[in-house]
Amino acid sequence: MGKKYTVTYKVAPQGSQYVYQADKNEHKAGDVHSSFGGHMWYVLNDGDGNKESFGFESKHDQMLGEGQITPFDDVAYQQTSYETTVELTEFQYNRLKAFSEDPSLVGFDETRYNVAKNSCVDFVFASLKAIG
């Protein structure tokens, strides 16, 4: 029997508590704030129990500006309103892993954040395109 690769998509509702895992702008690791608009991200499982979280955020906590991939969402967000796990083939897992490391593979611009058209929601949607 082969490995069971999975991806779990997660949604944190507006107002969810977020605990900073590293210093970011004026926030220090351990600071807590409420999510202004909610958030989406996903967690990859390699079939051996190793999990990696991938999300997309504003680098400077602004609605427009620089963007960045973040590995902290799964531990930083203290509640979710929705989660769904999808089993992946090895090919799909490898495609999603490659996308997670280089989102431009499917045309996603990780350098620019725009809450209206290049946000965490768009990042998650692009991840779905990556796995077909």
Language-model features, listed with the residues they occupy:
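Active-site nucleophile-His-acid catalytic modules used for acyl/amide transfer and hydrolysis
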Residues: F72-G132
